Amino acid sequence: MLSSDPPSAPSLEISNAIARLHKQYVGRGPTNVRTSIDGELVVCLLEGGHTRAEQTLDETDKGYVVAAGRLGLQEAMGDEMIEAVQSVLGRPVRSLMSANDVEHDLQVEVFVLEPESS
């Protein structure tokens, strides 16, 4: 179960790295990022950060264009996001999955880590 405890140093480092990458690729970063780490699962929830152009598209019922564009950008920055998580945690990332909720201006980055060696 994901915790709602205050962010740990690794969670904060990952949040900051993911926010920086989103700002670099999108031109505007999220207003809030929360990262939860639980075993092999790392979940980053990003709130806010839609550009004025994206807001306009959403307001004119073209949110699907925003979602497709965001997903493309998330795929483009995927290797760098994986590198950031691996660097902070010292563990390989097995998988990265991204999703967007345009209506609520939310994005999520889900990383699945390789199991720890015993």
Predicted regions and their residues:
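Interaction-mediating elements
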Residues: 1-118
